[in-house]
């Protein structure tokens, strides 16, 4: 018997009297189901497998898909997985995504509108629910089935809005409804991973005119909206999978559902932008390594009090250029080597400028190999700042004054400070506990010797290996702008309004890591140094672009060291902690 795409398939045949049958025929015409039936018959779709049916439907409508095959392949092949998408069309995206995602997850199930029962060939994909009555007790078994499927290690695709996207008169955009809290509940399932999806596109203008007249009436036109996607190119963007450990399960279901929604919007193609290409040909070869014996002799010649820390085979020192010119040259060479790995660097044989002549260089040496493994460049503001004839501060000797406009209220013009910058660790120490610890143990020892420095300030470079979306999220999550300082060259990439709205309601800071994982293809997390400053209770003031550092975004921050957690002060100040903390704040 020929299968019918008809409202009659949703109503028991025993209940279909003459009047109901007339209503079914009228409804089929009104809803476009009659046209679908013609499509069904002409293309001989009855009895096909779910895969064959999906392929033939897309062929019949001449719908072409645009998606990143590598992103599809990055979807986990096993284990509990939640996939969630926006719902721009109200129908065809369910068929498309079910077909596409089942290629990598044959165990995929899709939580779908009961209206899709008319496509009997696709029923094997679906777990049906009624989005028009989300609180209906009849939905409970399907929701229980979906949760059970995921708990058993299955993959589940949901459209948590439950309704097709609508035109928002305030933002003048087609937007998603709020996502059902079931999405948040599923993110709490132990071990579950989450892959956000965004389908670009919208329905016809007529569809949105109808919803302005009567919001519910638009549902009657979804069949026509499926048919009018004929000859369309549909773009699908699949985000990178968020692992369970980066999901903040302490948040409520509503917040987690809103997070999943914002992560879907983070994939929207029209809100992406690439960094300008760096001309690799413009980079000069690195300078030759300074001989170890030369470095050793200069280091041994430093005054004893400039030897700050001894730890295992490592030593930490500070020096000025006139004391150790070759050490500073080697630091500049290593800086350039490391910065180039992060799509930064000057392009010269060494990363150096005239500030190397007047700033303080704190560095770590491996005594066994006689190699430098890391360094910081520190500006002692009380040594650097001078007064102009008009009594104002001369900021020309402050490196970051090239990047930021410092008002009189900013700390570097109020008290002695250390400007921290140009930090690096050589590649073999970048993931080592010892590298970062020794740099900061050295900073702690320096502050112990010079306790007038209560505030540290500087920038954390946000490498252009990060996506612009990630940088914008970090800025929105951390920066609290004030009149005391502003960037001379602002980072002008606009954050997606739906992510911004999420941040205003729930906050972004606790969700930064989850956002970055779904954006960064290699799974990059918050930079280690930035995490370190966050643990020190840093204040974040502005995000600027450093024109002298390959146009790299720099996040300006400050740390009031006496207010840092006691555990960290003990770690870095060690025996000098008590004397440092009792040093009077008023002593300048």
Q: Where is each model-derived feature located?
A:
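Membrane-anchoring hydrophobic helices of lipid-metabolizing enzymes
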Residues: 1-87, 94-96, 103-105, 123
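Non-catalytic C-terminal accessory region of glycerolipid acyltransferases
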Residues: 2-11, 107, 140-288, 504-506
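Short acidic (Asp/Glu) patches
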Residues: 68, 78, 82-84, 90-96, ...
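Conserved nucleotide-cofactor-binding alpha/beta core module
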Residues: 102, 107-138, 146, 150
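C-terminal/domain-terminus segments
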Residues: 249-270, 440, 528-531, 540-573
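Conserved N-terminal entry element of GNAT/NAT acetyltransferase domains
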Residues: 281-322
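Short amphipathic alpha-helix that is part of the acyltransferase structural core
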Residues: 308-380
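Acyl-donor binding region in acyl/amide transferases
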Residues: 346, 383-539, 544-554, 564
């Amino acid at each position: 018997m020929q299968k019918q795409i008809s409202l009659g398939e949703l109503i028991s045949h025993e209940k279909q009297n003459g009047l109901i049958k007339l209503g079914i025929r009228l409804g089929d015409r009104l809803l476009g189901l009659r046209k679908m039936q013609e499509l069904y018959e002409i293309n001989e779709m009855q009895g096909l497998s779910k895969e064959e049916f999906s392929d033939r439907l897309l062929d019949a409508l001449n719908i072409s898909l645009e998606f990143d095959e590598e992103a599809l392949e990055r979807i986990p092949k096993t284990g509990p997985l939640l996939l969630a998408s926006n719902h721009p069309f109200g129908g065809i995206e369910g068929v498309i995504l079910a077909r596409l995602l089942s290629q990598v997850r044959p165990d995929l199930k899709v939580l779908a509108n009961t209206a899709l029962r008319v496509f009997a060939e696709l029923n094997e994909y679906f777990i049906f629910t009624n989005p028009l009555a989300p609180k209906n007790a009849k939905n409970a078994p399907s929701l229980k089935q979906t949760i059970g499927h995921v708990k058993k290690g299955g993959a589940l695709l949901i459209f948590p809005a439950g309704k097709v996207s609508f035109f928002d008169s305030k933002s003048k955009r087609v937007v998603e409804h709020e996502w059902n809290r079931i999405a948040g509940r599923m993110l709490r399932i132990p071990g579950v991973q989450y892959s956000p999806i965004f389908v670009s596109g919208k329905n016809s203008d007529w569809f949105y005119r109808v919803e302005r007249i009567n919001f519910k009436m638009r549902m009657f036109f979804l069949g026509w909206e499926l048919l009018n996607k004929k000859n369309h190119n549909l773009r699908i963007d699949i985000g990178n999978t968020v692992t369970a450990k980066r999901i903040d399960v302490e948040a409520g279901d509503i917040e987690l559902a809103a997070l999943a929604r914002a992560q879907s919007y983070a994939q929207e193609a029209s809100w992406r932008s690439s960094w300008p290409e760096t001309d690799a040909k413009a980079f000069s070869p690195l300078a030759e390594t300074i001989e170890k014996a030369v470095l050793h002799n200069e280091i041994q010649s430093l005054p004893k009090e400039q030897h700050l820390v001894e730890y295992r085979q490592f030593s930490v020192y500070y020096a000025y250029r006139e004391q150790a010119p070759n050490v500073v040259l080697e630091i500049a060479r290593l800086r350039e080597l490391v910065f180039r790995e992060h799509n930064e660097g000057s392009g010269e044989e060494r990363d150096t400028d005239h500030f190397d002549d007047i700033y303080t260089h704190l560095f770590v040496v491996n005594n066994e190999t006689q190699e430098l493994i890391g360094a910081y460049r520190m500006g002692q503001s009380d040594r650097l700042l001078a007064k102009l004839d008009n009594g104002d501060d001369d900021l020309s000797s402050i490196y970051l004054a090239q990047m930021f406009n410092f008002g009189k209220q900013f700390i570097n013009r109020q008290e002695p400070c250390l400007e921290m910058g140009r930090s690096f660790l050589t590649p073999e120490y970048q993931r080592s506990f010892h590298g970062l610890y020794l740099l900061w143990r050295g900073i702690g020892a320096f502050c112990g010797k010079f306790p007038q420095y209560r505030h540290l300030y500087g920038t954390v470079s946000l490498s252009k290996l990060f996506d612009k979306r990630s940088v914008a999220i970090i800025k929105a999550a951390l920066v609290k702008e004030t009149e005391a300082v502003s960037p001379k060259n602002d980072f002008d990439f606009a954050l997606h309004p739906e992510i911004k709205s999420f941040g205003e309601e729930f906050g972004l800071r606790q969700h930064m890591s989850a956002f970055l994982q779904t954006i960064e293809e290699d799974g990059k997390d918050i930079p280690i140094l930035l995490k370190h400053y966050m643990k020190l209770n840093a204040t974040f003031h502005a995000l600027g672009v450093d024109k002298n550092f390959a146009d790299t975004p720099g996040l300006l921050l400050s740390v009031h060291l006496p207010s840092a957690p006691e555990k960290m002060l003990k770690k870095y100040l060690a025996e000098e902690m008590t004397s440092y903390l009792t040093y009077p704040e008023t002593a300048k």
